[in-house]
């Protein structure tokens, strides 16, 4: 992920300073899509492991999320 961000930032800096070639623009778009895919996957994975508790201490995790969690447990 660090290398991915490094490449994205290098292309962004180059775009600001001198512009990008068509190939570099395509590469930049592909890198950004890959980055977003990884971030979304991480967020989704984190949400699949969340339990929601109300102020009274009751589990109020949505049914759909509980079903996903049950599938992940096997």
UniProtKB/Swiss-Prot annotation:
The lineage of its organism: Bacteria, Bacillati, Bacillota, Bacilli, Bacillales. It is found in: Cytoplasm. Belongs to the UPF0291 family. This is UPF0291 protein lmo0496. One of its GO terms (cellular component) is cytoplasm. InterPro entries: DUF896. It comes from the Bacteria. Keywords: Cytoplasm. SUPFAM superfamilies: YnzC-like.
